[in-house]
Each structure stands twice: as structure tokens, then as C-alpha cells.
């Protein structure tokens, strides 16, 4: 999340050191500690969620920010062990480590409901040119590209006899791929729709205040005011108005009447749609939902968030 591309060298250094370990236990622990460091520094922000309410949940924060990286790091440790089991030759096993680590990142994204956050490939997401690689080979295969780039400097400066040939073989296809990404972005074309306007409303309401019922009317008035601001100067353009996730205290279907009143105030144009986040209750279950509201106050679509990512 820091968008500092040179930091990827840190992964390469860790993988390079693991490559020369002989004991499977040491290899697993080294891979685990590398993964723990990666996920700890990248997922530190999860702890901030425990400060949203003044309850006992804050004491669980250390457990969350330590336990989650610890579990995710098992994938990295296991990948390193599998790579070493396939090839005991320390000179070449680093390439196997890269392949298996990329494979285990795919498994991490799908096993146990999946948690694909903070893959090494996400480093490319902070640059408009580098992220184009995703369109060619996808985010999972891009893990191989990022990990290979991270170890190239260490291969080049090592005592490995064929280091120049290996470095060149690895670098050429990556360079071609990156060049194609630059060309793709440089030759991009945009689809324009001058008849439709998207309005994103962010009232900047603190989470701990959002759930106070007595403040709901004030929060709603703020959302409505921001939604209709400059409406008269928009020449009756068709609009899509987007409110935040869990926009206000309340849930559907209990708040259908309230939603109808909101649509009367905001959706004057029949082709305008309000998209808002709202809780939905059904058979004693609570869903974090995306609600589409038309100008008549009718709910035309509902999408329930069933997975974290």
C-alpha cells in the first residue's frame, strides 16, 4: 500500500537467502517470516477498524493484526518447502520458489473462502503503465513477473556462472511485456457519454457517529443536500448518484417508505438512479447490500456482499 516500487527488492533478498537454506524446517520458517513481514506491513490498517467504536473490541486488535499475517504467512512457508522438495539444487531452486509462491498465492485467493489481498502483483497497481500487464496475463501470473524482477539483481551480482544468460532470459520477455503495456496505455481510447453524469456523494461522516439514531436525520439531510447541489445547472442530464456503503442508520425492507421519500427529493429526472449502500435483513440474517433506487422510489436491484473481497 506504500506505492514505493523499489521496496520489492526486499522480497527478492528474502527469497535469495531462502534459496541457500538446506533444512526444510529452516526453509519453512524463513518463508514464514518473510510472509509475516510482508503481510504485517501491508495489512496494518486492518487494526484501525477496532477503533471505530468505544467497546471491548479494541483489545482484540493485537490478535487480528498478528493472527491474520501469521496464517497467511503459512502459504509462503509452504511454497518455499515445496520448491525445495522439487529441486534440491540451491543454484536453481530460487526459480522454483518463484513458481510455487505464485501458485500458492492463487491457492490463497481461493481456499477457505479466499483472501487475495496484497499479492506481490499488486505492486504494479500503483502505476498506470505497469498495471496494463494485468490485461495480458492477469493478476495471478503477474506475481511471477514481480517476484522475478525482485530477484534479478541478486542473480546478476551472484557467483553463479550462467548468471548473465539466466538474467537475460528472464529479463527479455518481461521487458517485452512491459513495453506492450506502455503501448496499450498510450493507444487507449475512452468511451464518452456526454448525456450521463455520475455524482459520487461522500459526506465524510465518522463511523462511530453514523450509527447514532438521533443523528440520522442530520446525516440524511447532508446526503440529500450534496446530491441535489448544482442540480439546476446540470441541464436535466441523466444522472447516477452514488452514496457510500451503509449510507445511514437503518435497513431494508423496514425503511422502504424512507427510501421513497428520499427518491422524491433527489430523483426529479425519471432517468436518474440512486445507488446506495444499506443493510438488508432477511430471516434473521443481516446483509451488507447495494441498493438501486429509481425515480418512483422503487428498489430495482439489490446486490448482497457475500464475501469480504
Over which residues does each language-model region extend?
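Membrane-embedded alpha-helical bundles of multi-pass enzymes
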Residues: 1-187
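Soluble catalytic regions of membrane-associated enzymes that act on cell-envelope
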Residues: 182-309
Amino acid at each position: 500500500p506504500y506505492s514505493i516500487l523499489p521496496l520489492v527488492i526486499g522480497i527478492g533478498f528474502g527469497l535469495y537467502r531462502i534459496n541457500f537454506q538446506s533444512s526444510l524446517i529452516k526453509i519453512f520458517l524463513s518463508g514464514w517470516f518473510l510472509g509475516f513481514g510482508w503481510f504485517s506491513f501491508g495489512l496494518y490498517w486492518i487494526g484501525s477498524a477496532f477503533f471505530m467504536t468505544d467497546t471491548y473490541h479494541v483489545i482484540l486488535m493485537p490478535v487480528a493484526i498478528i493472527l491474520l499475517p501469521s496464517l497467511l504467512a503459512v502459504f509462503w512457508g509452504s511454497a518455499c518447502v515445496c520448491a525445495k522438495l522439487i529441486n534440491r539444487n540451491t543454484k536453481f531452486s530460487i526459480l522454483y520458489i518463484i513458481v510455487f509462491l505464485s501458485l500458492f498465492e492463487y491457492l490463497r485467493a481461493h481456499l477457505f473462502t479466499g483472501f487475495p489481498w496484497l499479492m506481490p502483483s499488486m505492486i504494479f497497481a500503483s502505476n498506470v503503465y505497469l498495471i496494463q500487464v494485468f490485461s495480458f496475463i492477469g493478476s495471478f501470473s503477474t506475481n511471477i513477473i514481480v517476484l522475478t524482477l525482485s530477484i534479478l539483481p541478486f542473480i546478476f551480482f551472484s557467483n553463479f556462472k550462467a548468471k548473465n544468460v539466466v538474467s537475460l532470459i528472464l529479463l527479455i520477455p518481461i521487458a517485452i511485456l512491459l513495453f506492450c503495456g506502455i503501448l496499450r496505455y498510450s493507444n487507449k481510447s475512452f468511451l464518452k457519454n456526454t448525456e450521463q453524469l455520475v455524482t459520487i456523494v461522500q459526506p465524510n461522516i465518522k463511523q462511530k457517529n453514523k450509527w447514532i439514531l438521533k443523528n440520522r436525520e442530520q446525516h440524511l439531510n447532508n446526503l440529500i443536500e450534496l446530491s441535489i447541489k448544482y442540480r439546476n445547472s446540470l441541464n436535466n442530464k441523466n444522472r447516477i448518484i452514488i452514496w457510500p456503503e451503509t449510507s445511514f442508520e437503518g435497513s431494508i425492507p423496514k425503511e422502504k417508505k424512507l427510501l421513497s421519500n428520499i427518491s422524491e427529493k433527489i430523483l426529479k429526472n425519471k432517468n436518474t438512479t440512486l445507488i446506495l449502500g444499506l443493510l438488508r435483513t432477511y430471516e434473521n440474517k443481516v446483509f451488507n447490500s447495494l441498493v438501486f433506487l429509481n425515480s418512483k422510489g422503487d428498489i430495482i436491484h439489490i446486490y448482497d456482499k457475500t464475501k469480504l473481497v
